[in-house]
Amino acid sequence: MRSIRIIAVGRLKTAHWKTAAEHYLTRLTRAFKVEETIIKDGNAALPPLERNAQEGARIVAALTPADLAVCMDETGRQFTSQQFSAFLTPMWENANLRPCFIIGGAYGLSDEVRGKARHTMALSAMTFPHEMARVVLYEQLYRADAILRGTPYHH
């Protein structure tokens, strides 16, 4: 079974985002082994750079040699859904690596985490709250699989 890992800073706190994320995670687990790693939010009393560094150290510590890190960042490469499915195909075909999507917290990702990335990807040129970004990523992963399988989810 193909494997996907998502590392995200902070638990989903808003009920509708939590419900939407669970909906797509349930769909994803039909086709993938999905590992979701939630990183504790950095100390809110810290300045943003220090908070990012704290969260970044936790993310880096969670990475494994099997993780092909894809950082989610507004400055990253943008894809159509078709392009995203094509981008994922070689990752899913590599038995030794799994795509590992990394979603930062309120202030994004630290430079240390960005330095570990094989790829940097943007969901849009717009900025999203990290809870929404997580749901959009889950939906796009599900859609990419539907495109590759030729199921009617993607029109």
UniProtKB/Swiss-Prot annotation:
Any one GO MF term held by the record is:
rRNA (pseudouridine-N3-)-methyltransferase activity
Give the encoding gene's name.
Answer: rlmH
- Know the name of this protein? Ribosomal RNA large subunit methyltransferase H
Q: Tell me which Pfam families the record gives.
A: SPOUT_MTase
Family of this protein: Belongs to the RNA methyltransferase RlmH family.
**Which residues are recorded as binding S-adenosyl-L-methionine?**
G104, L123, S124, A125, M126, T127, F128
Listed under GO cellular component are: cytoplasm
Q: Which organism is it from?
A: Oleidesulfovibrio alaskensis (strain ATCC BAA-1058 / DSM 17464 / G20)
Function, as annotated: Specifically methylates the pseudouridine at position 1915 (m3Psi1915) in 23S rRNA.
Predominant subcellular localization, coarse grouping:
cytoplasm
EC numbers on record: 2.1.1.177
